Every structure is written in C-alpha cells, then in structure tokens.
Amino acid sequence: MAVRIYRDKDVDLAWLKGKTCAVIGFGAQGHAHALNLRDSGMKVVVGLYRGSKSRVRAKRNRLKVFETADAVRRSDIIFLALPDTKMPAVYEKEIALNLRAGQTLLFAHGFAIYYRTIVPRKDIDVVMVAPKGLGPMVRNEFVNGRGVPGLIAVYRNRSGRAKRTALAWSKAIGCTRAGVIETTFRDETETDLFGEQAVLCGGTSALVRAGFDTLVKAGYSAELAYFECLHELKFIVDLIHESGMRGMRDLISDTAKWGELTVGPRIIDTRVQKEMRAVLRDIRSGRFAREFVREMKAGQKRYRRLRKAADGHRIEKVGRGLRALMTWK
C-alpha cells in the first residue's frame, strides 16, 4: 500500500510559533527534542521533578526548567518523554490535573494510549511523533543539517488541527528533512513491540546466544564462537542497513551467499514463523502489555531473575575480555 511521505516543503513550521512546547523528561529523546525545538526557534520549557539530576544539564543547555506541573500549566503542547513504566504515575500525579482544554499531548510511542495506561481527557488533542532513531542520532543528524525519518499519528483531533501540530513538531526536530509517514497509534505500537521482541532484541539475542552455545558445546573456543556469532554481526547489519538485503548479498562471499540461501530457512523455519505469529497475537490481544504492567507493579522479581540469567551468560564475560583488546574503539 502506497504511503504519503511528508517533507520539509509540505509542512508549515509557523504553526508552532507563539506556542509553548513542554518536554516532560530530559533523557535521550527529551534532550534531543528540546534542543532541536529550541534551535528551530520554538519556545521550549522542560518539566522535571524537584531534585532531578537532569535539571543542571537542561539549564546548561539554555533551557527553562520548571517542575512538571508548572511546565504543563505554562504550555500549549506537552511531550511526554518518559519511559512507559513511569509515564502513568507522572501523568496522574503531575499532568492530568493541570491540563486545560485545547492543549495537545504528544507521545513518541503509542504504548500508553493504545493499552490505556493513560486515558486523556476528551477536550485535548492527542498525537504521536516517533523518530525512527535513538535520541543522540536525532540530535546529531539535526545539528549536521540532516534528520532521521519519523512517524506521526493522531489519536484525538479535538481541535481539527492535531495533524498539523504533529507535522510541525516533526519538522522542528528535523524528521521531515528525511521524511515522515502517517500511521496510527495501534499500528506503531504493535509493529514496534513485535520488532523488538521477535527480531531486534529478543530474536537477535536468542539467536546469537544459541549460535555461541552450539559452537562452544561442540568443542570450539569461546573466543572463536564470540567472533563468529556476535562480533561480526555488526558488519552484516551495517551492510543491510546501508544497502538492503540484496545489497548485503552482493558484498559477501559466494560461500556466505550459498549458506544464507540454503541454511537460513532451516533456522528460521515454519515453526519459528508460527511462533512469531503467536507473539504478534499476544501483542494485539493486549496479553503482553497486561503481563508487562503486572510485572512492573508486582516488584519486577521475575524481570530481575531473567535479567540476571541473561547477564550471566558466558558470552558476556568472553565479550568483555575481547572488547578490551579492540584498541580502535
């Protein structure tokens, strides 16, 4: 299905002029959005809790800092640059009671809205601007005159101009320099979670560990297994990122190509694809979100146990030793 890509020429940045943009939180995304907005000539305030260590850093960047509730009261557009786990409590205690009709809530990810861990009042706009890059990349590309691609979505269009706000914000942080695609909160949330779980984080980590374990159990040195299953992964991912799958294939050896084409389907077979569909069902039904929220509220015991086991895998110790030898880093 063809999608429209919005670029700088399609968006009126003047729509944000005269409006106050509040960035709640000053982590990687909050830092990038706040500085890019400021450098685009927007009026920006940062909302942080009293005693936050980020206050000094924000002020050092010539940004006005207020406590969260005060920042909300002073603003027209409120960007929640907070982790999914912390966002509901901050919203309930500091944001909800200080909102007024006609303001806009802006998110970088759809989780809180789609799974209703936050339920905004009905007399405000609710939009999303999701740069497809980490915070430091969003900032660095902007500073260098470029931008990262992004997604926008409108959940509630009370004013009739919510999309205009999302596009203008996208332009102010540099995303329309590369291109912005319109989606929905549902589609962004479901595809983002699936990508993280099945491919980018869960799938890749499990595949690397399984390959490492297979070689070590077969009698090969752990160092050799690390190089072949983890270290060299970056080279292939970089090729795919820059040139696509076919471009990567053009640049690897004939031996590697034949192995990819004949053995790859044995590893990621129909059983794995069936499991991927089950993972997607859990995301779409809300089962994953319910389990995640329940675990966070219950003290994270299972999470900490799983994290400890993953962090204690032998590949971690081997990797630390080998990375120490890489003097070019």
Task: Name each model-derived stretch.
Residues 67-118:
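Rossmann-fold NAD(P) dinucleotide-binding segment
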Residues 32, 38-61:
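NAD(P)-binding Rossmann-fold cofactor-contacting core
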Residues 106-197:
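Rossmann-fold dinucleotide-binding core
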Residues 19-33:
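Glycine-rich adenosine-cofactor-binding loop
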Residues 160-164, 173, 179-218, 223-241:
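Active-site-proximal catalytic alpha-helix in oxidoreductases
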Residues 210-213, 217-218, 243-303:
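Interdomain hinge/lid region at the active-site interface
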Residues 1-18:
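A short, basic/flexible loop-to-alpha-helix module at the beginning of a structural domain
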